[in-house]
Amino acid sequence: MAFFAKGKMIAAAGAAVLSLLAGMAQAAQCGDGAAGFEEWKADFANVAKGAGVKNKGLSALAGAKYASATIKADRAVKKAFSGSVESFMQRRGASTIISKGRSLKKSNAALFNKIESTYGVSPGVILAIWGMETGFGGFMGKQNTVSAIVTLAYDCRRPGFFTPHAIAALMLVDRGALSAGSVGAMHGEIGHTQFLPGNVLKYGVGNKNLKDKSTALMSTANFLRAHGWNPGAGAEGNMGAIAGWNSAGVYQQAIARIATAIDGQ
């Protein structure tokens, strides 16, 4: 628990960051392409300093590159969650997630028993999210995390949403939980279950290293508990908590169905 005290500091900082953002998002001029990115970064550095980001985080910001691949992926988000829940589950390999999830539930029984006794969250939903997000850790992404999340904070579509996560990513760099070279998913998500940086600050447990399986799964349970998970109600009785994880209806329904199938074996 070398990071225990630091972890409490990170959580407190995360709560403050996530409450800040409406005004901060407007402090630097957003853009719709790479042309203004470097100028924006210089302005955003002042925003970051004001939020408490220190030298390592500011250095990571200075080194961030405009992430064209992230912008392309962001433009396609709605399409990825279109169609019926059945077609979505088929595209995402739900039957494989269920089969492997059942196997992992057995082979990691001690871990899932600990998670359930600590957080009240049943194994199925954790396994469903883990399988859906990264194929149980098989692919956690190759996009530079700082560049991705900073680009999204700069982009004019949703700066109010992504600015707190950009600040959080820089704070995580300051504290050593991320580095300027850390990689993850296209929208800056991190680790086995793909937390956005602000959620790492607020809900991550222990040393916040979400590339560690146990830390990631316990952090996921902590997130769900904080979003109203009701022990004993099962996944389908906890749609509100699942909605906190992902706002897409087809995703929520798929997770609930997969979780129920895993827990009901």
Show which residues each predicted segment covers.
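Bacterial N-terminal signal peptides that target proteins for export
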Residues: 1-13
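Cleaved targeting-peptide boundary
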Residues: 27-34
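Mature N-terminal segment immediately following signal peptide/propeptide cleavage
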Residues: 35-55
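Compositionally biased, low-structure terminal segments
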Residues: 4-5, 45, 89
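Cleavable N-terminal signal peptides
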Residues: 13-15, 25
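Sec/Tat signal peptide C-region and signal peptidase I cleavage site
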Residues: 21-27
